[in-house]
Every structure is written in structure tokens, then in C-alpha cells.
From Swiss-Prot:
GO terms for molecular function: ATP binding; D-alanine-D-alanine ligase activity; D-alanine-D-serine ligase activity; metal ion binding. It catalyses: D-serine + D-alanine + ATP = D-alanyl-D-serine + ADP + phosphate + H(+). This is Vancomycin C-type resistance protein VanC1. It is a peripheral membrane protein. GO terms for cellular component: cytosol; plasma membrane. Mg(2+) 2 binds at residues 303, 305.
Amino acid sequence: MKKIAVLFGGNSPEYSVSLTSAASVIQAIDPLKYEVMTIGIAPTMDWYWYQGNLANVRNDTWLEDHKNCHQLTFSSQGFILGEKRIVPDVLFPVLHGKYGEDGCIQGLLELMNLPYVGCHVAASALCMNKWLLHQLADTMGIASAPTLLLSRYENDPATIDRFIQDHGFPIFIKPNEAGSSKGITKVTDKTALQSALTTAFAYGSTVLIQKAIAGIEIGCGILGNEQLTIGACDAISLVDGFFDFEEKYQLISATITVPAPLPLALESQIKEQAQLLYRNLGLTGLARIDFFVTNQGAIYLNEINTMPGFTGHSRYPAMMAEVGLSYEILVEQLIALAEEDKR
């Protein structure tokens, strides 16, 4: 029986989301086909084979279950537990944001010679860096909102003022390399500017100031390596504010509609752009590609998630369910794609 190792946790602002997503993935893996190995990464970055109750993962008490936490070390082929070598057939890194989607875990798994679900090192790192992603998208004829890149060492107030004069308010101030809308502030006047910059810089050394696009957010899920399955597009509606971390995982005032109520021609255009990005950036396994669409039908790239949320109400599984892939089948196909990619 093949051994599937599911990774969760890590030193990331999205630690809690990872636990919830991973618990759902583990539940979906067929125990008659696969032996599941649950590997937790503590915020200290210590790795453990967790053999306790899955509910403890979901409610984040797994590290308190000491008798079921067995510390792992790495080898060039798998893991070492005591004197035993453990080599999973496929590793499913259900890790979001920092260290999970930025190429770090992918590089480690490459060094360990382990097949894994999702995009490779370069593609993961590129999609995490929104500024570089948008520069490359521009070469493909795919538009992004007007954006100013700032670094912790170069953030001239005069440059910021010129950007605001050119594009006006509202603007979004966001970390260049963070996921799940962490550290993002919608700014409507200068009084909130410095506070928003401080918040964003807490997540990294580079920050984006981006013109707010009036319209709706549309997502497009893609599954596959050579042969692609394009999921249904979804649309996000908010009573107020923007689709921040709390809205993404608690749905306080957000409504997600799948399939998105789009004219057929516009939907086709969005899917074409999503496929172009997926192919040209060398994405594999899965991704959710998010756009803004104005009332006039203009399309702007927002971001690409190379390991989108996998909770029970997450967008990516819902997109795939709409085209006939249940959560369980989706997980099984991702495992198969990882094996195919390694070959």
C-alpha cells in the first residue's frame, strides 16, 4: 500500500488555515488505497510524525499530545525516526503562505528526492512574489492594477505622493510576499497611510501600493500537469470592505458564487488568461488564479495561489466540484499528478 505523507503547520501566519485544510485532506484520502502519514511542523520548525486523533490537528492541540508526537529528521531519501528510515511515496504539503508556497518546502522535498503535490521551486517562488508575477504577466499581455514597489530601505515619501496623485484613492497597501490577504489594508486617505505601511512591512521587506480596482473578484481553478482541467470560475461579493483573511476563512459578510454569473465571452477570456499564466509560468498540480473584473469587462490579474485553501468551504475544491470532481476524487487526482510529475 502506498504511503502518503500530509504536511501541515509551519512558521507561517497561515498556520491555523494549514491545520484545517490538512485535516480535510487527510479525511478525504481513501484508507483502503493509501496509508496516511500525518506530519506536523511546529511553529519552531521542528517536524513530527503525529499519530494521534485527527481532531487534535483541526483544533490545534496536537503538539500537546506528546505521546503521539515523534520527532523526525531528514535524509537524502525521506525521514529518519530513531533508527528507522521512512520514505513516503508522495508528500502532500498542505502549507500556505510563507515557507509553504514560496519555494522553500519544495526545495527541501527536491533535496529529499520525494514526489510532492503542487508546483516546483521556481514557479512557487515566482507566484509568491506579486511584483515579479505582475511583471511577467505584463509580457504576456495580461494586465495588473497600477502598482508601486517599495522596500524597507527605499520608500521615498515623494514617490508615494506622486503615485497617489496619479492614481488617487482608494489604494491597497499589501506585503509583496504573503498569502491569504495577510497584512493588507485598504487606504482611503493619507491619514491611514503610515499605519498601513507599518502593517505590511511586518510581513516582509517589500511592500506594494496598488490602485484599487472597482469591480468584482473572480477566481479560476486549474488542475493538471500536461492535461488541464479548468474548474468553474467563482465570484466574490462583499457587503463592505475587501476579501481579507477573516472573510476568506469565516465568511462574515462575503458571498461566494460558483459558477460566477459572467457572460460566456468574458468567462472564456478569464479562463484563457488563467491557462496562459499556468502554462507560461510552469505551474504543475494545481493553482487558483485570481482576477479583478470591472463593470466594463476589463480583466486585471490579482494573484496566484499555488496551494489554495482546502477547508470544507474553500474556493478551489468548490470550483472543481462544479465540474464534477468531488473533494475525494480531487485529492486522489492530485496524488496521481505528483507521481506522474516525478516520472
